[in-house]
């Protein structure tokens, strides 16, 4: 039957479906056959007029109420609009129906728009065929009912993994996620090899924790028990990153699970970890009073697919989240050093706690840097070990938001919420997150909801403040036990094989402990390696004085370059006079002022091909109008940086970066400190806008 062009007043009443109509129009224009025939008839020659005023909706709410209120033209496919409205509801709100808590103590809040009846769909409608072309989970040759569609939407968006993406305004980015979530319906690829690899990593994590728990009773280690799915998450992240072209990963994390990450991801020798627990010679390393769960480490690994990656875990203090900007600064410096212009080869990974991610201001400062030209790194992967408690503080007392991750919505990035008791979904979330980061060069967040089996540390008694939670935790099987039971039930592995793997890994740790104690293993901290290998280190007194003078001719050459403007550049009249004054200073006619002296100092380094990077609030002009490192054409606003043009060929001088930073002290100083760690052969400067503003970055100064 041929239909007349649609009455688009129907569309005006559908709110969220305006986006759907726009997508339909685009698909129909590209290929009319790609759209359901009934909907294609609506689009044929249709033009959207101005807004229409729908009738008052009946009670009940949701898009279904709007549908009921309309006088729908004969033949308009109401089911298609209702089905699409239900699909959009799951895409927007499905995460609210996910059972995220592995303990089952908190139920999902749900959302009324996830109910078919709130979209005008009756129980009889659910037995009718679902219109085609509405979502990405359709399979060739099948004809599911609307009830089937609802079930599959629940599996895709409301099972053990939920995705927040409604806050992302770019439809291409939402579509990227929908195309990957809907066909698989929230299931990791049914691959026995991958499942056994997940199990093996869980066993490694569990065996190490239990070994330390029995051999070093009461010693603080901030165990990962309750959140051990972090280990397969990171293991597969390395695999996915290698396949995506990443060559180096810089990680930052706090104390929770750090020893497990060091041993089972970075490959730190267990006997070295045991030596740190035994602490036979506390004065064997320079520096004192640091602890084993602050230590950093670097190593080269090869993924199972054969890709070589360099992994670095940054040293960190007990001050939560202080390491975040330091890691991102290191990533940016490595990208510069490796010529990673596309920001695809070096990846930053930050592992947070739920209370700290919501509570620490440095998190927001670091997130805000992610899109800024002077600080962007192509996207950081944020992983929250969400054990639903901050030391002794409940979430209701530590944040004002539903999720601990809500601060990240300001970046319009996807946020994956996953139940840590389901490691296959944890790995699937990691795969999606990595793919999204590489495709769109933005941050991505994984909120892994888990629990903490012991107190904040192993000598703490959590039952004082969370008695009901810890009664439940005492009865809760471990993640390894749950997953191995699941694989046994699916005939993927036999119980005897699991027991054999556990026994073998325990025996290996026993041998490592025997060797550590028989040989008197001492803790080792390696520094002055990599880009620092050519530096001697030590105290200031042990470093010989060197001549830092610069020939007069070199300074005059720099002065001429920085006071010469390109043709057709029109400076502000006051800037023109300033350049004339600086030219006179360069000739020696008048004494240098601070601004000119600084330019000559930077220029002398740049002439020797040394990188110079300066950032701070209003640093390009200078707070007191003293610097003017960036000049702007008065006619068209085009910027010109004299210090970047000392030579006709930019390869014949050092790179000069002068950056107006975000209005942040701690975050920006942390970033620049991190940058300097991987650029010892460059001059990296953070400038406090006023001298006393430096105390806004006090944690960075004190701890790093």
List PLM regions with ranges.
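Subset of Sec-pathway N-terminal targeting signals
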Residues: 3-46
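Glycine- and acidic
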Residues: 5-10, 23-24, 213-225, 247-251, ...
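Cofactor-binding active-site loop characterized by glycine-rich and histidine/acidic residues
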Residues: 247-412, 416, 624-679
